[in-house]
UniProtKB/Swiss-Prot annotation:
Top-level lineage group: Eukaryota
One function term, GO molecular function aspect: U2 snRNA binding
Subunit field text: Belongs to the CWC complex (or CEF1-associated complex), a spliceosome sub-complex reminiscent of a late-stage spliceosome composed of the U2, U5 and U6 snRNAs and at least BUD13, BUD31, BRR2, CDC40, CEF1, CLF1, CUS1, CWC2, CWC15, CWC21, CWC22, CWC23, CWC24, CWC25, CWC27, ECM2, HSH155, IST3, ISY1, LEA1, MSL1, NTC20, PRP8, PRP9, PRP11, PRP19, PRP21, PRP22, PRP45, PRP46, SLU7, SMB1, SMD1, SMD2, SMD3, SMX2, SMX3, SNT309, SNU114, SPP2, SYF1, SYF2, RSE1 and YJU2. Interacts with RDS3. Interacts with LEA1.
Principal location: nucleus
Domain called RRM: residue spans: 28-106
GO cellular component: nucleus; Prp19 complex; spliceosomal complex; U2 snRNP; U2-type prespliceosome
UniProt protein name: U2 small nuclear ribonucleoprotein B''
Gene: MSL1
Source organism of the structure: Saccharomyces cerevisiae (strain ATCC 204508 / S288c)
PROSITE patterns: RRM
Amino acid sequence: MVEPARKKQRIDRDTHHTVAEPVTEAKNTLYVSQLNEKINMQRLRVNLFLLFATFGEVLKVSMNFKKQRGQAFITMRTIDQASLAQISLNGERFFGKPLKVEFSKSETKTL
């Protein structure tokens, strides 16, 4: 289970006071990079869907090869499913290249 976001402490360089800054909260969207760019985009999208569906319900696979070659965003139904997929697939080989799977830093728009 993912814990709720907490505040992380840091020291302000100018005032030397402790400042609370938010810790990034895990989301149900994963950022996948290091995808093999030689594979057809439709084939890659279908295979990413099937791979991530092993860990739960995939709501969306977003890819934009014009702007972000070799990258995709995978939206899972729950944070727990996304977490399981991230832990299980990070570093695994996919079409000959090791996947880099991280939680997306931007908000997901799909519900």
